[in-house]
């Protein structure tokens, strides 16, 4: 659970590193999609249990919820591609990702247009 009410609440979100799961990494590597990627580019993860992961290559999370915070950073970044200013909103996401973020944006646009017709 993450709440962002003020700019200072974004500090942890902005410090969250990107990540990739080991199976996705190996597939992308085999396809030649990781040119320029180094061990410092982000976190390499291996699923352990349903909601647990192991961080590989002797790295540690900067803080307990770093993976969750990176997902929030992805959401804010994806929505910011479409608008300069985000409205106050309460957004709940389970298993989010870039496709889900685009769906949220479409719903936000529909809502704004219904409330404030041109």
Name each model-derived stretch.
Residues 1-118:
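Short acidic-hydrophobic catalytic motif
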């Amino acid at each position: 659970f993450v709440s962002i009410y003020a700019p200072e609440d974004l500090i942890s979100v902005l410090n969250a590193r990107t990540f990739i799961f080991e199976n996705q990494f190996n597939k992308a590597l085999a396809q030649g999609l990781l040119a320029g990627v180094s061990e410092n580019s982000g976190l390499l993860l291996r699923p352990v249990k349903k909601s647990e992961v192991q961080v590989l290559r002797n790295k540690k999370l900067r803080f307990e919820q770093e993976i969750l915070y990176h997902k929030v950073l992805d959401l804010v970044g994806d929505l910011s591609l479409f608008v300069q200013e985000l409205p106050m909103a309460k957004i709940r996401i389970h298993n989010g990702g870039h496709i889900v973020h685009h769906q949220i944006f479409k719903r936000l646009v529909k809502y704004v247009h219904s409330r404030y017709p041109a």
